[in-house]
């Protein structure tokens, strides 16, 4: 929390559900009853609609919230360009796209005081914000809270995956406390401040320029399973009444812009709607897997999906590989060898990924683009084909994947950083040729 600010919060901490119409007020009586924009809002608050979709979008796709705030959002000076450091957006054409398998070691923590915004580094992406399609993949590393500084992204919604250190996201609509093993999603345009309760934090961000993340259809799985709606948590209303200079940074068409407000814009006293920030504990994921034979397709591990115009072919799927029982009979249990029309960026929150015995460390990443062969390394393969196939639980692990229908293009930084493992291809060296009779 910024020095001297007092956050006033509604009773309780979170509202349960995914895609719900929520209503919450930090001060009793602040939320108008029966209409959105009365002639005079309670207490002289300003009624403001935040639209995340076109007015005429189908109801099932329509996202908007009504905010009741101390000052209108329009009350601010002009924004000025701000140095963007290593933050990038599409089109990702700094360097030629590479068909090679790529893997990165974790980056060292920052040596200088660095907050969440300054600590964002773009590794790869596709599409671009102007087209309303694609994703940008960033890593963050920070060692100080944002103080008298607020950020919002006009280019897309942010799916944040903490890897080390908790984040406290103080948003316009309330507070999200997010720890490693959880995720948070902040909608396009929602302003927030990232605080570091433990003094340091690192993790991953998927900036989604396309359709909203939503729960995947379950098909024959039925009405329950995977990520259940009740386990998603949206914050209750919270606001601060601060008349002190505050820097507001926005990302707009790939560039950062800054304006100096005379107050904190985190001043929404009450709100209702369905365009909301939310968090989810990945330990609540109801993992589906085989109880007979073979390794099912990894789509069974999808937490959230951003669809494209092609049915079943995602702009981005967010997939996890959590602790789970492996019981398949007469089966090669790790993920099999694969060439995929989709492109895959993987990260590791903690533990060891079951298809890589070494080299893939928490805080690192890997990229396997369209039709690049990948799969278990030789050590993992040899262990798996000789394993005693009794029931086995994979414990203390959490890997994830951002999968996209479009080629994921690395940035110049990602291709030139010393963290890029030049020997990654060697993990597939030494496989013996099969011997035919």
Swiss-Prot record:
It catalyses: homogentisate + O2 = 4-maleylacetoacetate + H(+). Homogentisate binds at residues 353, 374. The active site is at residue 295. It is an enzyme of class 1 (oxidoreductase). One of its GO terms (biological process) is L-phenylalanine catabolic process. InterPro entries: HgmA_C, HgmA_N, Homogentis_dOase, Homogentis_dOase_bac, RmlC-like_jellyroll, RmlC_Cupin_sf. The keyword Transmembrane does not apply. Pfam families: HgmA_C (PF04209), HgmA_N (PF20510). The keyword Iron-sulfur does not apply. GO terms for molecular function: homogentisate 1,2-dioxygenase activity; iron ion binding. Its cofactor is Fe cation. Its EC number is 1.13.11.5. Keywords: Dioxygenase, Iron, Metal-binding, Oxidoreductase, Phenylalanine catabolism, Tyrosine catabolism. Fe cation binds at residues 338, 344, 374. GO terms for cellular component: cytoplasm. Belongs to the homogentisate dioxygenase family. Hexamer; dimer of trimers. This is Homogentisate 1,2-dioxygenase. The lineage of its organism: Bacteria, Pseudomonadati, Myxococcota, Myxococcia, Myxococcales.
């Amino acid at each position: 929390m910024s020095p001297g600010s007092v956050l006033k919060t509604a009773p309780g901490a979170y509202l349960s559900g995914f895609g719900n119409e929520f209503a919450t007020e930090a001060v009793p009586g602040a939320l108008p009853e029966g209409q959105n924009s009365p002639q005079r809002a309670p207490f002289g608050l300003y009624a403001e609609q935040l639209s995340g979709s076109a007015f005429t979008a189908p109801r099932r796709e329509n996202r908007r919230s009504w905010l009741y705030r101390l000052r209108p959002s329009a009350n601010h000076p002009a924004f000025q360009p701000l140095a963007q450091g290593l933050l990038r957006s599409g089109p990702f054409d700094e360097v030629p796209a590479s068909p090679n398998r790529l893997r990165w070691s974790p980056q060292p923590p920052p040596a200088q005081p660095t907050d969440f915004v300054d600590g964002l580094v773009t590794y790869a992406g596709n599409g671009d914000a102007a087209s309303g399609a694609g994703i940008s993949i960033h890593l963050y590393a920070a060692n100080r809270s944002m103080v008298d500084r607020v950020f919002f992204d006009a280019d897309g919604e942010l799916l944040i995956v903490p890897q080390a250190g908790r984040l406290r996201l103080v948003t316009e609509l309330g507070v999200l406390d997010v720890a490693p093993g959880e995720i948070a999603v902040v909608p396009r345009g929602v302003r927030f401040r990232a605080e570091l309760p433990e003094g340091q934090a690192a993790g991953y961000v998927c900036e989604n320029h396309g359709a909203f993340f939503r729960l995947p259809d379950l098909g024959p799985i039925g009405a329950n399973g995977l990520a259940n709606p009740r386990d998603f948590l949206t914050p209750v209303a919270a606001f601060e009444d601060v008349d002190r200079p505050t820097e507001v940074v926005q990302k707009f068409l790939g560039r950062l812009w800054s304006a100096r407000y005379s107050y904190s814009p985190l001043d929404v006293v009450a709100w209702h709607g369905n365009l909301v920030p939310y968090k989810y504990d990945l330990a609540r994921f109801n993992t589906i897997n085989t109880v007979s034979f073979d390794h099912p397709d990894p789509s069974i591990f999808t937490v959230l999906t951003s669809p494209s115009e092609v049915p079943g072919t995602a702009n981005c799927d967010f997939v996890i590989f959590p602790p789970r029982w492996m019981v398949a009979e007469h089966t090669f249990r790790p993920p099999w060898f694969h060439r995929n029309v989709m492109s895959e960026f993987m990260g590791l929150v903690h533990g060891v990924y079951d298809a890589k015995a070494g080299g893939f460390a928490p805080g690192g990443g890997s990229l396997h683009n369209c039709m690049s062969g990948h799969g278990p390394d030789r050590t993992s393969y040899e262990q798996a084909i000789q394993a005693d196939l009794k029931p086995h639980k994979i414990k203390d692990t959490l890997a994830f994947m951002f999968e996209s229908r479009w080629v994921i293009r690395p940035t110049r930084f990602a291709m030139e950083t010393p963290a890029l493992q030049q020997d990654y291809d060697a993990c597939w060296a030494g496989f013996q040729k099969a011997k035919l009779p």
